[in-house]
């Protein structure tokens, strides 16, 4: 089973406004992931409030955001922002059933994370496609994925129901 978790976006001194961690639950360590390309942020962006930053985090399709992950899993995908993050391409190999995949997504402008939930659903669909075309081996432990929302300041259980969504292949 692969668990995909939604976490809030992260800002740091380099201006990277998204993060993704792959947790190896057997080795008890995080695999370091690096971004190699991101949208151009304005000078002085670090002084902007989170609300002001959001308009730069949610572009209207003028440019894609490319992430390259320097990990043993060789994960690469392109994220394009419209009204929410949408995963447009995903490739992976050598995925382990012990890995927890956490995906950081930007909330929509009205402050909810429905878009993040949609991203996770789309990610699961891409994983299914990779299985279909043989990029990920179809084995019994890959029969379903658990999608879980965690650490979201705008998450409301009464609005979204259960905090785990099982996507069956």
Label every PLM stretch briefly.
Residues 1-169:
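Cell wall/extracellular polymer interaction/catalysis modules
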């Amino acid at each position: 089973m692969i668990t995909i978790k939604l976490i809030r976006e992260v800002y740091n001194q380099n201006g990277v406004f998204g993060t993704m961690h792959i947790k190896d639950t057997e080795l008890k360590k995080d695999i370091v992931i690096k971004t190699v390309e991101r949208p151009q942020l304005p000078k002085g962006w670090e002084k902007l409030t989170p609300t002001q930053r959001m308009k730069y985090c949610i572009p209207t399709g003028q440019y894609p955001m490319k992430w390259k992950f320097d990990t043993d899993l060789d994960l690469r995908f392109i994220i394009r922002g419209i009204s929410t993050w949408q995963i447009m391409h995903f490739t992976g190999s050598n995925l382990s059933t012990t890995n927890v995949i956490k995906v950081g997504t930007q909330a929509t402008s009205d402050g909810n994370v429905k878009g993040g939930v949609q991203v996770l659903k789309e990610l699961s669909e891409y994983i299914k496609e990779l299985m279909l075309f043989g990029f990920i081996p179809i084995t019994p432990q890959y029969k379903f994925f658990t999608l879980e929302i965690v650490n979201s300041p705008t998450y409301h259980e009464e609005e979204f129901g259960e905090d785990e969504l099982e996507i069956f292949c």
